């Protein structure tokens, strides 16, 4: 678990990530959720976020995706955010090096965004992350209560609520993730039912950035 001012990878986190990566590879799952961040370190991230500049996100983007939140992008990779990114990269490196045939290369996060939703926000409608994002996408909820769901289509059919409680890292496969039948589909997901607001951070590897 990642704690305040120190990086510590326990075997449990590594094993859960290894199992989760294999489950996605074998078509048994479409995401991973792992307890990883301590409450004191979450407070550090929230404190850093309070000093960042947020702007209103565009209401409509891409393939008719509706958004109702404020965003800080690009969020700086320094301070507690850098510690978080480095720690997750180390977690992946440890897990991937322990697999005989890892489905991805270890990610390097060069695209970081923070999102802030107010209570009662409609969230973000079902969508796929852009294909330029490779390996995995990491979502970390820092505060608030809401539903992060993975579904089958853009109508939200067969939505499954993921465990994105503060302290967990939520992992979605991205472009280049190897699956057993070689037919990979980027997960469709959305956020709704926002109570008490929501503050989250997303970490991605953008293939268009050197």
Name these PLM-found stretches.
Residues 107, 132-133, 155, 184:
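Short solvent-exposed loop/turn micro-motifs enriched in small/polar/acidic residues
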Residues 116-119, 132-148:
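Short, conserved beta-strand element in jelly-roll/cupin
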Residues 2-105:
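Non-heme Fe(II)/2-oxoglutarate
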Residues 124-127, 186-188:
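Glycine-rich, charged/polar anion/phosphate-binding loops
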Residues 125-137, 157-158:
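A short beta-loop-beta micro-motif enriched in histidine and acidic residues
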Residues 149-210:
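Catalytic core of Fe(II)/2-oxoglutarate
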Residues 108-118:
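A short glycine-rich, His/Asp/Glu-containing loop-to-beta-strand
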Residues 120-123, 172-173:
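Short Pro/Gly-enriched beta-strand edge/turn motifs at strand-loop
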